[in-house]
């Protein structure tokens, strides 16, 4: 079974980094409503588009998701 996207993303937290992956990790950590137990692209993408209290480049998200799948 694959780790949830959130669990994987938390391994990428680095407040000193300007990489999109580290930025998303820090934003997701601060967002209490972020879907923490899913590995479903549509669920996470929909959350980022419609419910997140922050904005994030969805093109960067697509690249990060691809990296998650390859991990």
Swiss-Prot record:
SUPFAM superfamilies documented for this protein: YozE-like
Top-rank taxon, per record: Bacteria
InterPro entries documented for this protein: UPF0346, YozE_SAM-like, YozE_SAM-like_sf
Family: Belongs to the UPF0346 family.
Family matches, as HAMAP family: UPF0346
Name of the protein described by the UniProt record: UPF0346 protein SP_0947
Originating species: Streptococcus pneumoniae serotype 4 (strain ATCC BAA-334 / TIGR4)
